[in-house]
Each structure stands twice: as structure tokens, then as C-alpha cells.
Amino acid sequence: SMNNFSLILRLTFGKTRILLPGDTNRAGYGGIPPEKLAADLFKVGHHGQLDGADAALVNAVRPRFSVCCASSDRRYNSAHPDTMRLLKDSGAELYFSDCPPVDGQSIPPHRALEFTICADGAASARYLP
């Protein structure tokens, strides 16, 4: 898939790591040692489609926060329920670029997500109205 030519970028600020895999699906991570994938904030690859993450990838990343950029109409199965459940079951807090109901919880209308990362490694996230 051409999506697997996406740049996989991991940023580190103090003790906080951010993994930005672009449109990569799980096959695109081949050859990257699992310890290089560990991240506190994970932008889910391939818009959270079913091939965007699997258990092995989620176990390697171990995210505290996961962000899924998906279309509100869920075209192409973005933010696939199985992928979101896998991330949620791992303990990650889920955030979305749109406002879908997730497990019965509504997400407030928003225009942006704000992640605050402190030098001591503390991090928080919130939607901006």
C-alpha cells in the first residue's frame, strides 16, 4: 500500500514521546524495533481503520493518549470500533478529530485538541470549543 510510505515520526520532549505514523497501516511498521515505538501520545495510523493498529503494535506503543483523525460519516471505516476498543482496553485515553459517540459517551463539539506536556513528563489533554 502507498500508505506505508508515510513518514513514521517519533518526537521526544523530556520524558514524553509522541508517535506520528501518518497514514501507515500496521504492515508499515515492519523492521522498527518495538522499543522505538513506545510513546505517550499516539496518533493512530491509517485513520484508525481496522488495519491501523493491532495488539502487537498497541503493546509496543503503550500510549497514555491516542488520537484518531477520522471523518464524521465514518467513511472507509475510519475509527473502526475494534481498533478503538483495542486502544481503550490498553488503558489509553481516546481523542477524536470529529465528534462521534464512543461507548455511549458523547464528545463535545470542538475545533481542536490541546495537549500540554510539561518538562517533568506530566501531560494532559482537552478539547477546545
For each predicted feature, which ranges?
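Active-site-proximal loop/helix segments of hydrolase catalytic cores
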Residues: 1-79
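Binuclear metal-ion centers of metallo-dependent hydrolases, dominated by the metallo-beta-lactamase
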Residues: 1-3, 65, 72-129
